[in-house]
Amino acid sequence: MLLDRALPCLLICAAASAHAASAAAPPVRIILVGDSTMASSTGYGDALCARFSPETACINLARGGRSSGSFRAEGRWDEVEALLRAPAGFNATYVLIQFGHNDQPGKPGRSTDLVHEFPANLARYVNEARALGAVPVLVTPLTRRSFRGAWVQDDLAPWSAAVRRVATATEAPLVDLNRLSMADVQAIGPARADALARAGANFDHTHLGPAGAARVAATMTGALLRAAPPLARVLGSAR
């Protein structure tokens, strides 16, 4: 009889203890580093941040028009390093790094050499993030939604391949967003792909409106959970 009465109490106490332990666990921090396809208003970064649990710090430092070279040259990587150096009490910090669009030729002051400079820049970001205790995650560039006939054009393939090679060489987690987003855009076709863009005068085949940001954030969520399984406790559907 006493055991029968005590068992519910034990179960309740155990559940409360587990909840308290979970609540007391140090939070996770996410830092986004990249270009306009990840940045606020034009990319998926904020929509991705909304998919993390409320106690997770998600900081979107991606900026439009930046390449793997100009992001550092402008001092923006210094902001990332300052965050990583400051005592913050996080259980883990993940730095998502996505470049490629503005590293392509024809962008004065931003373009980088694909063979040497671009991969060296990425590897340096990975190594410096690790040296400061963070987990770097490399992300291949989001596809452009440009079709030739019935087929989406893979004009970022060489830069995506370079990102994959750096991820292999540095043993960094990889999200192959280029491959995933290309497959998605190909599957839905040109008309539905156009609905992912910003409306009106801001329309183009690169940047994202709200629907596009939400769709890419959902793709990123699944890919991140595969690339970095510990994020499962803080990453889910949009809140």
Which ranges hold each PLM region?
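Conserved phosphate-coordination/catalytic loops
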Residues: 71-75, 116
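Serine-esterase "nucleophile elbow" of acetyl-processing enzymes
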Residues: 19-70, 78-90
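Alpha-helical cap/lid subdomain in secreted, periplasmic
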Residues: 79-214, 218-236
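Bacterial N-terminal signal peptides that target proteins for export
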Residues: 1-8
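Short N-terminal or domain-adjacent regulatory/targeting segments
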Residues: 2, 13, 21-22
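Catalytic-site microenvironment of enzymes
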Residues: 239
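Bacterial N-terminal signal peptides
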Residues: 8-16
